Amino acid sequence: RCLNPYEKAGYEEMMKVAASDELEIIVSNTTEAGIQYDPSCKKEDCPPSSFPAKLTQVLYHRYKSGKKGIIMLACELIDNNGKELLKCVNRYIEQWKLEDGFKKYVNEDCMFCGSLVDRIVPGRIRDAKEIAELEEKHGYVDSLLDVGEVFGVWVIEGDEKLNDILPFKKAGLSDKVFVVPDMSPYKKRKVRILNGAHTGFVLGAYLAGKNIVRDCMHDEVMKGFMNKMLYDEVIPTLPLDKDDLLKFASAVSDRFNNPFVNHELMSISLNSTSKWKARNMPSFLEYVREQGKLPTCLTMSLAAYIAFYSNDIQ
């Protein structure tokens, strides 16, 4: 079910869920801009604007209700997402002058795990005919009907004992969900290559008249630009197994060319400032550091980003 915490009834219901015995796991996916500390958020806000402040309220209500700690799975594409989220919560504990017992509860009874999701999910289905056909086929109305690629991997950083707590192994998803002690190699590969490719070419492609990712893969200039960026400017900066990187990059074109996924460029462009900083800037800076010159494609990508946000672009 979905709750709207910006409505009084929805906020109250959210707090009831926070204190429920059934609640064991919270998953967050609030984009690169989501895990941010906002000092303007107050304990009395219903709800506060930032996600970490909302989470602090939820955990505090759960603590005051005498319920056990939860497992927090952060999916945002930032470094150390679980740890950064915990840092924000601890800052709100200090700002709101909450008791030491709650701070101990958050840091010892709750488990903040970093994680990495690798699956292209372009958004809800908009075609009325397709929606009607799916509803007829399955026999029910789904107001949150979405579409995603078949490929999917979720890497969770944590102790092996998480496999006994989380339901994925029992659900037969051992080939798609991995619990590992260090997810940084998986994250760097995915963020720099797959996400970096998306953010690296979509703004320029949109300015050139394209609307969906698949169309770009059918354009020799666009696809050539993406491949040159990946193989000449991104992969050489990654201190990981080169065969693995080349194999992963090779699959990117096929995934972007999925005939069943209409991934809109404007959807990917959301929060491009934080995305370019997280996905492309590290490759840009490391290339300059190693080669002593500007990377041609990444520099053009940066120029397209500036042009995209220019007042001259409609």
Model-derived regions: residue spans:
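Substrate/ligand-engaging "lid" and interaction regions
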Residues: 1-314
